[in-house]
């Protein structure tokens, strides 16, 4: 079965607010019924917040839209990334003030908070899952 793909074109047919990318993201969020799925849940939003000079990240205005949808649905969102990306996330616009929730390293500040799972696959004997990701509901 093919996956459903959601797409919002950057093209604006008219100079109206509803034609902007943030407004199109709001329509996708509505179609995904995010608000209906998160009540009372701790919701991790995993993303790449950039590293040093990185600029190919999702703009904070879009992240805030997703965060706000989770909050509107009664969820408790937070953003995670790897330690070396989240350390300077505020300098790239990813802060509690701009996106509406905290940004944490997924496996803790020292990258030592994880759960190991024994699930052999080919030459891999175990998998390590970042603690904050596994702990989210």
Model-derived features with residue positions:
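N-terminal and secondary-structure boundary signal
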Residues: 1-137
